[in-house]
Design a protein with these regions (language model features):
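Contiguous, well-folded functional domains in the mature portion of proteins
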Residues: 1-238
């Protein structure tokens, strides 16, 4: 469209150069969209016992965490804590924390206070210039998916994805059980600009390591949680 507009600008007498300016803007927008929706192939590592990043981008942080609460069931609504940003929490974690049965409330673990129920969380921020197609961190089967909107708004609050607090933006949580029976949690999180999470799979889908399972449009982030007694984070620059 941008090229067509520029051709029109050359063939006709431009009005205050508005046609030329419009053509340049359209050309730039087309280039941005083509860059954003690119989906190049990736060389997926084949080493056993590792998890690969579910997203292209920059690692915001890697933190060891422990669950201190979970989303309440209907029977537990009378015994829950309310947070104005994050919503209602039952003040006990899941009986099997690392089963990731529902969304849990996590807190950082201090050095010296580690336990076998801890997990590592690695947060990957995707800028508008990064590839926004997300991939499975390991081969396995999706055993749970959960969509949550931001607290207090229809889909918001849409905090910038590079902020830690953005973990409570609109999000889709996917639990993958690997071939060895280990469960990991991948959470696609919308950002201030990216407001559309597009899952391409569902519960029961079997994925290969590195297989595409969804995307988030424009700027956003993906969090990966994995058992800390099995994995440890290693950041390797591309």
């Amino acid at each position: 469209m941008g090229i067509s507009t520029l051709m029109v600008a050359v063939l006709v007498n431009p009005v205050m150069h508005l046609v030329t300016v419009a053509g340049i803007i359209c050309l730039m927008l087309s280039a941005f969209l083509a860059n954003f929706f690119r989906d190049p192939d990736r060389v997926i590592p084949k080493e056993a016992g590792i998890l690969v990043s579910p997203a292209d981008g920059h690692v915001m942080f890697a933190v060891r965490e422990r669950a201190t609460g979970r989303r309440p069931s209907k029977e537990e609504q009378s015994n829950c804590e309310n947070h104005p940003l994050t919503g209602d929490w039952h003040p006990e974690a899941c009986e099997e924390t690392l089963s990731f049965q529902t969304e849990q409330r996590w807190v950082p673990v201090e050095v010296g206070g580690e336990s076998d129920d801890d997990c590592w969380r690695v947060a990957v921020f995707m800028s508008p210039l990064d590839v926004h197609v997300n991939r499975a961190c390991e081969a396995g089967t999706i055993v749970a998916m959960e969509h949550r909107t931001g607290k207090g708004k229809r889909r918001g609050p849409f905090l910038p994805a590079f902020k830690k607090e953005s973990e409570f933006n609109e999000r889709v949580r996917t639990v993958l059980e690997t071939e060895s029976g280990i469960r990991v949690e991948m959470t696609q999180i919308s950002g201030a600009v990216a407001r559309t999470i597009v899952p391409w799979t569902g519960v029961g889908t079997t994925l290969r390591r590195g297989e595409r399972y969804g995307m988030i449009r424009v700027g956003s982030r993906v969090d990966l949680r994995a058992p800390a007694n099995i994995f440890k984070p290693v950041v390797i620059g591309a």
